[in-house]
Amino acid sequence: MITYNGGNYDVVVVGAGHAGCEAALATARMGYSTMMLTMSLDAIAMLPCNPSIGGTGKGHLVREIDALGGEMGLNIDKTFIQSRMLNTAKGPAVHSLRAQADKTRYHIEMKKMLENEPNLHLLQGEVVDIIVEDNTVKGVVTKTGAIYYGKAVILATGVYLKSKIFMGEVNYESGPNGLFPALYLSEKLKALGCNMRRFKTGTPARIHKDSIDFSKVSVQIEDEEIVPFSFMNEALEKEQIPCWLTRTTEETHRIIKENLGRSAMYRGDIESTGPRYCPSIEDKIVRFSEKPSHQIFIEPEGAETKEMYIQGFSTSLPEEVQVQMVRSVIGLENAIIMRPAYAIEYDCIDPTQLKASLEVKHINNLFSAGQFNGSSGYEEAAAQGLMAGINAVLKIRGEDPFILDRSEAYIGVLIDDLVTKGTNEPYRMMTSRSEYRLVLRQDNADLRLTEKGYALGLVKEDRYERYLLKKEHIKNEMERLKTTNVSPTIANPVLERAESTPIKVGMSLYDLLKRPELTYENIKEIDGTRPQDLMKDAQFQCEVMIKYEGYIEKQLRQIDQFKKLENKKLREDIDYNEIDGLRIEARQKLNAIRPLSVGQASRISGVSPADISVLLIYLEQKRRKKGEVE
């Protein structure tokens, strides 16, 4: 191949999905020239599967991205067509915002943002090779022979590496939605010593809206009050588009069971691992054979299209079987398929080869993010992209990496799980993965992370001022609630209506709000000094902090214990073979993962509590020797 110098940049980002977009915007906004290469400019921030952002655990990630100065939250606030808060019957720790996206507008708005970023250059092209000299990345080579040099390179290749589509007996090399696959980069990465693996995911069919019998399906109404994803938006008003709910039938299950032998997964054509928490419909029917039916959600793909997404109905069965299956579902008897379902298989890296900064351990200045790292989902990808972008800049500057631990953010949980434990299937974020979810709520992501984003230069002055104002409102309101007392004469009529125990002596509003049956709203008439300009976010924070005070304090004590082990740092160059007392498996795992702290070491599969005790003794001996020398 004849090559030529395409240009020199501080950072080269490979891929323009959700990881690539956040990575490129972060590096450019931090003042570094960035080249962003993508297989197709028409697929920037594409939503190839579910047309939604957020959901359980994922909504937390979007809020954290926003708090750090990322773009995903702002973009979905501009382009959503329906918004719902999930898990509202449970406590605030698991409340998760989810928005149905207009997928075309989502792409357009994100592309516009990238095009208008001064330090960012967008280019359509396929990267086929990576230049590495002396274990340090120097740039990338495209299919047309252009070499783009960079001080750091971020791989955000999504599901495109050697990607292959499966529909029954039919399979062919392709990216999602009929786009080109990237067929060459995987082998180059293997040659550079990267341990690659094969994962799979899938997407359901899209059907024509006019072919649905809406009289037979249930409408799923949106929330009246729209809660924005971005902390920069106080309130949003928009006419929303509903989703619908239906169910499979006995006939659906019969068709699937009779054709299981034609499923690419059950035929054995697909040997890779799929996402546990997003199984295909044939997998659900085999695994849960006792269930007479399964829920199916029908979701619009946008305001200007009649394509409808059938959530919960992904499959790798042949196209003609898909037609029968879809038409056996209640309300879809005359459904017309516009895009058939398919499974897609792709290459990704074993994430235990990455540092917590998302830098590849054996190749300096090469970072990676998103589905390439073994995760699933747009939100997980965007979170990693943001962190990879930040850390690429910090590496160029010669500064320490920016790492969030498990007690600081869901982003910290996500990355720690990937690089410490690895994953044998596409990793999905859920609230249950966090040990400290009462502290890591989606509503307080700005209070946890905005200060950090500001220090990095990603949070601009207007956002920072809004954050400071919210903090001040919370502080002042908490003080007011503690010092404002109400008498039994005033309080008891309100308490009676709320079926709350009457009081015999005066009580502060703070103590009244501790009662689970009382809310900010139903004590309004006995709260004569409530500020009229109190921010809604601040009001919510106060109520949560008061009601869950004891639980939060308990979790903060647990975090203090967690931090003690996290603060016991381990050098990256330790030879664990030389530490007496470690078991062979522990030595192998510790040498492979190279944890940054005793806390991280304790989370590695195969490292026992006894091994951790050995490490603590080793560190104490090192500390004493250092003290004696000094």
Swiss-Prot record:
Annotated binding of FAD, by residue: G15, A16, G17, H18, A19, G20
Entry cofactors: FAD
Pfam families per the UniProt record, alphabetical: GIDA (PF01134), GIDA_C_1st (PF21680), SAM_GIDA_C (PF13932)
GO molecular function, one term: flavin adenine dinucleotide binding
Domain of life according to the entry: Bacteria
Alphabetical list of SMART domains matching this protein: GIDA_assoc_3
Keywords: Cytoplasm, FAD, Flavoprotein, NAD, tRNA processing
Chain sites annotated for binding NAD(+): 274-288
Family matches, as InterPro entries: FAD/NAD-bd_sf, GIDA_C_N, MnmG, MnmG-rel, MnmG-rel_CS, MnmG_C, MnmG_C_subdom, MnmG_C_subdom_sf
Function: NAD-binding protein involved in the addition of a carboxymethylaminomethyl (cmnm) group at the wobble position (U34) of certain tRNAs, forming tRNA-cmnm(5)s(2)U34.
NCBIfam families: mnmG_gidA (TIGR00136)
Matches recorded under HAMAP family: MnmG_GidA
Name this polypeptide is given: tRNA uridine 5-carboxymethylaminomethyl modification enzyme MnmG
Organism, scientific name: Alkaliphilus oremlandii (strain OhILAs) (Clostridium oremlandii (strain OhILAs))
